[in-house]
Amino acid sequence: MLERISFISKLRQLQLIIKAVLALSLLFSFAVFGILTSSSPVYADEEKPAMRIQISPVENRVTLNENEVNEYTFNVDNTGSEGYSFKVYANPYSVVNEQYSPSFSNQNAHTQVSRWITFKNDTGEYSQEATYSVEAGQRKEVTYKITVPSDIPGGGQYAIVFVEAIPKDDNSGGIRTVSRLGLRVFGRTNGETKESAEILSHNMDSFYMSGKIKTNGTVKNSGNADFNAIFKFKVEKIFGGVVYEDSKGYDVLPDTTRNIELTWDETPAFGIYRITSTLNALDQSRSTTKIVLIIPVFMIVILLMLLTITIAWFIILFRKRQAQKSKLII
């Protein structure tokens, strides 16, 4: 009888320990949730900087035919508090790695258009570089033309038009900050065009302890013209219902390989979802669907603690029964 009372007492103690662990776990979870969801302080609007540039549009896709001359325009807005002068000029546009770090100096067969661009100055003349002025809160329209020669390569042509503010005080002995924005010019010539895409990889993890859920892939362009690789991302609950859906396009330039990534920015701290990721590039397509688990580290620690307590309880129970059997044999 005493042994039974002792066993029941130990069992109750173990139950109290489990309840205490669960209570502490809940308190810790609420504390973490409160930290993650606490609203950021609101600050008053910052004072306008003296010099600030805004351009529109930021990209121009054009058709380039032999011996043609075409004019285009873009706007430069002074959103700062003071007037300033700025200059415009064109540079080659290319990339130097699979992460698509841009290069504005490397020249190749697909950057010749940067030499075909000239700008109309205030006197009506065209030149490789032009300077203008714009007052605070005002807009300046810039006109440029592309003069296409008779002998042009087939496929795509890429350049960037820079708008660079000219500081009023040029202190050569100090640090000079330059404000510069760019407008991408993507051209397609009327020569022979070859389009070729290859999806080299398409991956998505199934388990996350922190961070944002993402899917990534690698696309190769073996042609002579750019194309748009489309990433699609669909997140569903296990028992149905779409939680999140997104689609994004990525330019892939000729003779390059690009690593691309799509991220679920509002990934929750905990959950289990069915996620479908699809990558399309010209006539190539890959799709994968996975069950993805998101579980933070502190919850893993709690589960391990509960598992340890459960195992300890079974060990105590097993030893108790073994001891009882031994006494009965004696």
Give the predicted meaning of each segment:
Residues 47-71, 200, 204-209:
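N-terminal edge beta-strand
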Residues 82-113, 141, 147-192, 266-300:
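Terminal connector regions
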Residues 191-301:
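Membrane-proximal extracellular "stem/stalk" segments
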Residues 322-330:
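Cytoplasmic C-terminal tails of single-pass
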Residues 60-63, 128-134, 148, 247-252, ...:
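Beta-strand-rich interaction surfaces with strong enrichment in secreted/lumenal proteins
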Residues 50-57, 82-144, 230-231, 237-240:
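Surface-exposed binding patches on compact interaction domains or structured appendages
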Residues 56, 67-73, 140-142, 154-160, ...:
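Short, solvent-exposed loop/turn segments enriched in Ser/Thr/Gly
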Residues 67-72, 132-145, 253-263:
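Short Pro-Gly-centered flexible turn/kink motifs
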